[in-house]
Amino acid sequence: MTDAQRRAAFTHLLHSFRSSQDQAPAQRWLLLEASHVLGQQLLGLHWRSHCWMLRHALQLRDGWEVAGQLLRLALVPAGHLLDRLPRGNTGRTTVPATLPMDMPPAISALIAEALRTTRRPPGQSPRA
């Protein structure tokens, strides 16, 4: 997948998250976790995914998750600088920050759907 495809699908997932206020918190977390897994390889997207996770944790008044997201935001630059990014890690405080993970099926499905939704035929330019 190209960086442009990754960015488009990442943006789609965040849009889905912002549009999902009527869904249960667990379902909304899945959207943020999918954005983290997808965006983890690009510093800007990785940073944004943790910022959104922090924001969501603050809205839920989840102190443990807030603390974990602050720690992860501190680790993101070093992880990229040292190329120590645990592939597939969902980015939540419920899993160790350095643990590589197999992608959970629900997250894999969300990423696949985001990629399908944002795919353009070759040669077609993005809409302005």
Q: How would you label these PLM feature ranges?
A:
Residues L54, L58-L60:
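Internal catalytic or translocation cores that form aromatic/hydrophobic pockets or channels
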Residues M1-Q40, L60-A128:
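N-terminal alpha-helical interaction modules that lie
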Residues L13, L31, H46, H50-M53:
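TPR repeat positional signature
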